[in-house]
Amino acid sequence: MTHLTRKSEKHYSLDDDGGLEMTKTNSGLWLIGLGPGDLSAMSLAAIDAAKDCEYRYLEGYTALLPENEMSRLNEFVGDFEVSMRPAIENPEQLFELAKKARVALMVVGDPLQATTHVDLQLRASEAGIECHVIHGISITTIVTGAVGLQSYRFGRQVTLAYPYGEYLATSPFELIIENKERKLHTLVLLDLDPTGMGVDEQKPMTPAIAVDVLRKSADKLSINIEDWNIALCSDMGRPEQRIFYGTLDEVANINDGSIHCLVIPGRMDELELKALQRWK
């Protein structure tokens, strides 16, 4: 484990009048959002907070930082280690450090978008550890705006999981159908871990696998989805981001990009339909 000494212990918070005041703290846990994956979108507050921590970890299983950004993060904030699922879900070592030193857990996107990190925040509070949050731009914010659909017309967000052997989880698809029945759009995040264990190197789900999972889920529930048009959003928030709107077959045949998500539209008004069709 890398122990880093910082000469600065300065942090800023809002005073009673809404202005910034400088505070000092020698210990605690910082949940720091890095933004969508292009560190150019990382806030100055996030960089400053991470620099001021003595221990820095990059959470590596709920989201994925592109390989070319790893060295850049090191340049921005200093040395860090990657933490996978066991260290986050069993955070005793993390908490022991946070009781006596400043500890940063850096997360791609916004740190409180995943329930994993909300749970960590609550457990830290129960353990008497002060927990600070530096928010970042989330995939939810980027995608809903970029595709041109109204954010208030989205239903529950789902994550499409890899099949595990013979087992295929249909609950994500059931939520998509529930949203459609309510005339709501669905943001579908794609699984990063074929093992489901959160310990190995991540392997983002491809568009072809995602479409296959949708079709198998539909077959299992005897629902016909072959007339669906969906949006594929790739590498969002990065210079190479791409949006494509088309049929299931068209989406499945796209090989470009590295990290993807889907938007499955519900009922669209005229403006939303026009906005979405520009991505065909």
Predicted region positions:
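Class I S-adenosyl-L-methionine
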Residues: 3-6, 11-130, 134
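A contiguous loop/helix-start segment that scaffolds small-molecule binding in enzyme catalytic cores
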Residues: 29, 178-280
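Short glycine-/acidic-enriched loop or helix-start segments at secondary-structure transitions
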Residues: 41-43, 67-69, 115-117, 143, ...
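Short, surface-exposed amphipathic charged segments that create phosphate/polyanion-binding patches used
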Residues: 94-100, 146-150, 167-174, 201, ...
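Class I SAM-dependent methyltransferase SAM-binding "motif I" and its flanking Rossmann-like core
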Residues: 109-186
